[in-house]
Amino acid sequence: MRALVQRVSEASVVVEGQVVGAVERGLLVLLAVERGDGEKQLEEMVRKVARLRIFPDEAGKMNLSVKDIEGEVLVVSQFTLAADMRKGYRPSFSLAEEPKRAEALYLDYCQRLNQHEGVVVAQGLFGADMQVKLINDGPVTIWLDLPPQEG
């Protein structure tokens, strides 16, 4: 499971001209589910994102999480983060999970982030052609990569 996490002052997702998800201060998470991802990756990614300390405290040090600041998280599925570029110039997406299972894990991820960690979650629309708008705060961008299970 891979995630590109961006600290934002605002972010939104538009599908066919309609805003389907939006947040104010918080995080934008672009999430890719890979073949072999399971419960271990799901739980760890939920914890990592909810507890990632990338917001400034009163001294200006990155020491607070999105939970600490009572921020929001916009989660957008993005299978292209699973691109394999080891050969040639055209990306291979063979590492990405098949859509039906990927969608189930994506929705489970969003639900757990909200229910288990108490974070307000907005979502993109899985599998849709989306326009993502954001104001990156900092900018702060963090790459999280949790390898799939063996076998």
UniProtKB/Swiss-Prot annotation:
A Gene Ontology molecular function term of the record: tRNA binding
Keywords: Cytoplasm, Hydrolase, RNA-binding, tRNA-binding
Reaction equation(s) it catalyzes: glycyl-tRNA(Ala) + H2O = tRNA(Ala) + glycine + H(+); a D-aminoacyl-tRNA + H2O = a tRNA + a D-alpha-amino acid + H(+)
Domain of life of the source: Bacteria
A single Gene Ontology CC term: cytoplasm
Gene Ontology biological-process entries: D-amino acid catabolic process
EC number: 3.1.1.96
Pfam short name (any one): Tyr_Deacylase
Main location: cytoplasm
Gene3D superfamilies, alphabetized: D-tyrosyl-tRNA(Tyr) deacylase (3.50.80.10)
Ranges spanned by the short sequence motif Gly-cisPro motif, important for rejection of L-amino acids, renumbered to the chain: 138-139
Subcellular location: Cytoplasm
Domain comment (free text): A Gly-cisPro motif from one monomer fits into the active site of the other monomer to allow specific chiral rejection of L-amino acids.
Summary of subunit composition and partner proteins: Homodimer.
Described purpose of this protein according to its UniProt entry: An aminoacyl-tRNA editing enzyme that deacylates mischarged D-aminoacyl-tRNAs. Also deacylates mischarged glycyl-tRNA(Ala), protecting cells against glycine mischarging by AlaRS. Acts via tRNA-based rather than protein-based catalysis; rejects L-amino acids rather than detecting D-amino acids in the active site. By recycling D-aminoacyl-tRNA to D-amino acids and free tRNA molecules, this enzyme counteracts the toxicity associated with the formation of D-aminoacyl-tRNA entities in vivo and helps enforce protein L-homochirality.
UniProt record similarity statement: Belongs to the DTD family.
Name by which UniProt lists this protein: D-aminoacyl-tRNA deacylase
Organism, as annotated: Magnetococcus marinus (strain ATCC BAA-1437 / JCM 17883 / MC-1)
